[in-house]
UniProtKB/Swiss-Prot annotation:
<comment type="function">
    <text>ATP-dependent specificity component of the Clp protease. It directs the protease to specific substrates. Can perform chaperone functions in the absence of ClpP.</text>
</comment>
<feature type="binding site">
    <location>
        <position position="36"/>
    </location>
    <ligand>
        <name>Zn(2+)</name>
    </ligand>
</feature>
<dbReference type="InterPro" id="IPR019489">
    <property type="entry name" value="Clp_ATPase_C"/>
</dbReference>
<dbReference type="GO" id="GO:0051301">
    <property type="term" value="P:cell division"/>
</dbReference>
<dbReference type="InterPro" id="IPR038366">
    <property type="entry name" value="Znf_CppX_C4_sf"/>
</dbReference>
<protein>
    <recommendedName>
        <fullName>ATP-dependent Clp protease ATP-binding subunit ClpX</fullName>
    </recommendedName>
</protein>
<dbReference type="Pfam" id="PF06689">
    <property type="entry name" value="zf-C4_ClpX"/>
</dbReference>
<feature type="binding site">
    <location>
        <position position="33"/>
    </location>
    <ligand>
        <name>Zn(2+)</name>
    </ligand>
</feature>
<feature type="binding site">
    <location>
        <position position="14"/>
    </location>
    <ligand>
        <name>Zn(2+)</name>
    </ligand>
</feature>
<feature type="binding site">
    <location>
        <begin position="114"/>
        <end position="121"/>
    </location>
    <ligand>
        <name>ATP</name>
    </ligand>
</feature>
<dbReference type="GO" id="GO:0016887">
    <property type="term" value="F:ATP hydrolysis activity"/>
</dbReference>
<dbReference type="InterPro" id="IPR027417">
    <property type="entry name" value="P-loop_NTPase"/>
</dbReference>
<feature type="domain" description="ClpX-type ZB">
    <location>
        <begin position="1"/>
        <end position="52"/>
    </location>
</feature>
<dbReference type="InterPro" id="IPR050052">
    <property type="entry name" value="ATP-dep_Clp_protease_ClpX"/>
</dbReference>
<feature type="binding site">
    <location>
        <position position="11"/>
    </location>
    <ligand>
        <name>Zn(2+)</name>
    </ligand>
</feature>
<dbReference type="InterPro" id="IPR003959">
    <property type="entry name" value="ATPase_AAA_core"/>
</dbReference>
<dbReference type="GO" id="GO:0140662">
    <property type="term" value="F:ATP-dependent protein folding chaperone"/>
</dbReference>
Length: 406
């Protein structure tokens, strides 16, 4: 090839001519340079490292829980239940190619607990521990096909995006759907009319969680005939659902009262138990408004208790990525040593307990508490240490809009 002809050829991807690269490889009407080949190779290797093929799970239930303990404080029973469910799920995958007379069903999980009790954090941490793609959705935004709103397939698209469109990795991922209690039917009886935000969504989810091959539009949005689709098999995707289920406690109490046969002590024991959701049975969820088929596809049910002041105080400092550690790091970047008195931490936890917003309320309080300091201290060479005391917490919070309603 003559020099003039070489220089007229350029890489079809980056546009560089032959003299600007070490090698230019020709194909039918296209060229690619060695630099673009190296770049593509790096991308493929990175995707291969991002998500291992989780056909086998090296971690045992105790080891899974141990990692969860590093990030999630309290909720011991729920962490144990989740660890076993996840272990069994991926053990099922590792034997999926083995011919067996016994077909093992998926261990989809339902987490019942108040706002801020750690439902989302548990699901997200599990995905991180297992190194699998993770997607999250809000059940209240979903509608069945044909209605205005978000299709169930869009959740699968989020999972694909989290997996860098690696279909094999996505098919072994975890999907967390929050606020599932908000899509309950208005009554236990089947309605003649369609319930767009209730039973219809449950029916749409049912097909996906029990296992099907879904056609997912790569650009999202509604499906149309001229669009290309990505086929994703949901058989091996683990679904975790979460919800506060306000009013379910009354249903549980009513069931115990009806079956107690005069043993009032048993009813009183259930009624006074703060963790009444631990008595949840599938029939209670059906009475609440979830359809029987949907409940039947979620064999593992566990409850999370409301976080008390003591647990909230531990959450501030103990997790690997605790809020106190995060804010200390932020101040450290400005060469400022941030310290908290124990009494200050107790007061912050007390404020969060009053708000009843759980762990997520802690960040709002800390943000309000440290706002002025984060505004004033950067660039002030006279400040090299800040110590937060109980008195500062009380004084700074007196006029805070965050607490005016309390």
């Amino acid at each position: 090839m003559a020099d003039s002809e070489k220089n007229s050829c350029s890489c079809s991807f980056c546009g560089k001519i032959h003299s600007e690269v070490r090698k230019l490889i020709a194909g039918p009407s296209v060229f690619i340079c060695n630099e673009c080949i190296d770049l593509c190779s790096g991308i493929l290797q990175e995707e291969g490292r991002s998500y291992k093929k989780t056909d086998t799970l090296d971690l045992k239930p105790k080891e899974i829980k141990k990692v969860l303990d590093e990030y999630v404080i309290g909720q011991e029973h729920s962490k144990k239940v989740l660890s076993v469910a996840v272990y069994n799920h991926y053990k099922r995958l590792s034997n999926s190619g083995v011919i067996s007379e016994v077909e093992i069903s998926k261990s989809n999980v339902l987490l019942i607990g108040p706002t801020g009790s750690g439902k989302t954090l548990l699901a997200r941490t599990l995905a991180r521990v297992l190194q699998v793609p993770f997607a999250m959705a809000d059940a209240t935004t979903l509608t069945e096909a044909g209605y205005v709103g978000e299709d169930v397939e869009n959740i699968l698209l989020k999972l694909l995006q989290a997996a860098n469109f690696n279909v094999d990795a996505a098919q072994r991922g975890i999907i967390y759907i929050d606020e599932v209690d908000k899509i309950s039917r208005k009554s236990e009886n089947t309605s003649i009319t369609r319930d767009v935000s209730g039973e219809g969504v449950q029916q749409a989810l049912l097909k996906v969680i029990e296992g099907t091959v879904s056609s997912v539009p790569p650009q999202g949005g509604r499906k149309h005939p001229h669009q290309e689709f990505i086929q994703i098999n949901t058989d091996n995707i683990l679904f975790i659902f979460g919800g506060a289920f306000d009013g379910l406690d009354k249903i549980i109490e009513s069931r115990h009262r009806g079956s107690s046969m005069g043993f009032e002590a048993n009813v009183q024991k259930v009624s006074k138990n703060k963790d009444i959701f631990c008595y949840t049975e599938p029939e209670d969820l059906v009475k609440f408004g979830l359809i029987p088929e949907f409940v039947g596809r979620i064999p593992v049910i566990t409850s999370l208790s409301e976080l008390n002041e003591s647990t909230l105080c531990r959450i501030l400092v103990e997790p690997k990525n605790s809020l106190v550690k995060q804010y200390k790091k932020l101040f450290e970047m400005d060469n400022i040593d941030l310290q908290f008195d124990d009494s200050a931490l107790s007061e912050i936890a007390k404020k969060a307990a009053v708000r009843k917003t759980g762990a997520r309320g802690l960040r709002a309080i800390l943000e309000a508490l440290l706002l002025d300091l984060m505004f004033e201290s950067p660039g002030d060479v006279g400040i090299n240490q800040v110590v937060i005391s109980k008195k500062m917490v009380e004084e700074l919070m007196v006029n805070s809009r965050l607490f005016l309603k309390h």
